[in-house]
Amino acid sequence: MGEIDAGGSFRRIMNYFLDTNIILILFFNRDNELEPTILSILRDNRNSFFASTVSLLEIAQLYRRRKFKDIDYKVFDTGDKLIDLILSRLEEIEVLPFERREARIASRLTFVPNHKDPNDLAIMAHAISEQMPIISCDDKFPEYISQGIIVLYNKRSTK
């Protein structure tokens, strides 16, 4: 699927799966951490963006461990309040349920050296299941390409 842009060039319209770190960068308005090509993809309203319910679980776990420096834990006294705000502010992201099909794919993925995060395997499995490239800042994700994932790796910059 695609369209011809104003300059006469063919422009492919894409679906993208977002890793938790990208969701949080968007929520906290830290665009300076995004490479120009990734930022361009994320700002293009012709693209569609998806995430896994596993990312919501990861956000809840990060909240529980008080890993967010940019939020007031008195205002967000429960993790679900933070998740609700993230989902309302980033309404262009459709959250998809993690189901049996994704669990089966995750069970076939094998960890690469120095990477043991089961949430990451679940999120990658979800992207594989949906046949979408995943946008992530996790430098381990590209090491899974041989296992069927398509990764758009964003090397964080702190300009």
Question: Which residue stretches match the model-derived regions?
Answer:
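Acidic, PIN/NYN-like endoribonuclease modules and their adjacent C-terminal/linker elements
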Residues: 2-13, 124-159
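Conserved beta-strand segments of alpha/beta enzyme cores
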Residues: 48, 92-94, 148-150
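Active-site neighborhoods of divalent-metal-dependent phosphate/nucleic-acid chemistry enzymes
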Residues: 89-137
